[in-house]
Amino acid sequence: MKYRIFKMKYTLLFLSVIALVHIFAVEAKDEPESDALVPQERGCLDIGKTCKDDCECCGCGNVCYCPFDWFGGKWQPFGCSCAYGLKYVCAHKQKKCPNV
């Protein structure tokens, strides 16, 4: 008898957790996606986001870093991403980029 009550309690607890997870999943789907900003709509990209130019990265000292930037050009087989730059980057970006 005790085993049956014990089993029933844990079954109800498990079903309650499943129902709670389902409710949060449904609420997440119902939120409008129009409020979400697309990276192109924002003025700049955060650290770690894929970029093509220094001007796309947020902040005065952040740069578009290409770890495998071979031959000095912007040919990057593995892509570039926004990263923290050095102090002189800020002066360079202010000359180059209108949005800094």
From Swiss-Prot:
UniProt superkingdom: Eukaryota
Coiled coil spans: none
Keywords associated with the record: Disulfide bond, Knottin, Neurotoxin, Secreted, Signal, Toxin
Disulfide bond entries: 44-58, 51-64, 57-82, 66-80, 90-97
GO MF terms held by the record: toxin activity
Prosequence residues removed at maturation: 29-41
Residues making up the signal peptide according to the UniProt record: 1-28
Tissue: Expressed by the venom gland.
Compartment annotation: Secreted
Keyword Secreted carried by entry: yes
Recorded family membership: Belongs to the neurotoxin 09 (Tx3-6) family.
Domain topic, free-text comment: The presence of a 'disulfide through disulfide knot' structurally defines this protein as a knottin.
Entry function: Probable neurotoxin.
Name of this chain's protein: U12-ctenitoxin-Pn1a
The species this protein was found in: Phoneutria nigriventer
